[in-house]
């Protein structure tokens, strides 16, 4: 958060969408997390992907993203999208492609933070 890689979230904002979040834990210790937020137009955002430093490069982050994408497919979303400032190549390896502002649902597009210079990535899920 301090380096601007992640967006700061309040406890209240997380609590409001707690069911959107998944965690990777071993012995009740959380080592990674992520969220799948539903939007209009049958789309969902993969968000808040974070992995503890000692678990990076272990596949935890990829497993979380794959789980969220599989969940989106099961729930019938037509597309998932994400915004990233740092992990572009990693998300490409997971199957995401470059997107544009027009690919975002209107409510997300209307609140896009141009100051972050986030790249928009998309993954059509198909039927």
Residue ranges and their predicted role:
Residues 23-25, 120-124:
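Short, well-ordered beta-strand micro-motif
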Residues 51, 57-70, 82:
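Conserved acetyl-CoA-binding loop-helix of GNAT-fold acetyltransferases
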Residues 83, 92, 97-120:
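Conserved catalytic-core motifs of GNAT/GCN5-like acyltransferases
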Residues 71, 75:
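Short alpha-helical functional segments enriched in proximate histidine and acidic residues
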Residues 42, 86-87:
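A generic "binding-loop/recognition-motif" signal
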Residues 1-30:
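Active-site rim helix/loop that mediates acceptor-substrate recognition in acyltransferases
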Residues 23, 29-38, 42-50:
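Conserved beta-strand in the GNAT
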């Amino acid at each position: 958060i301090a380096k601007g890689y992640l967006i700061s979230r309040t406890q209240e904002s997380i609590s409001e969408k707690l069911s959107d979040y998944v965690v990777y834990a071993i012995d009740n210790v959380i080592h990674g997390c992520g969220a799948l937020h539903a939007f209009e137009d049958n789309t969902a955002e993969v968000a808040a992907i974070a992995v503890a430093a000692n678990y990076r490069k272990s596949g935890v982050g990829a497993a979380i993203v794959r789980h969220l994408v599989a969940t989106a497919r099961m729930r019938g979303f037509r597309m998932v999208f994400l915004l990233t400032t740092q992990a572009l190549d990693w998300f490409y390896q997971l199957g995401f492609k470059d997107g544009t502002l027009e690919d975002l649902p209107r409510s997300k597009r209307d609140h896009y933070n141009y100051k972050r210079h986030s790249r928009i990535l998309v993954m059509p899920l198909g039927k």
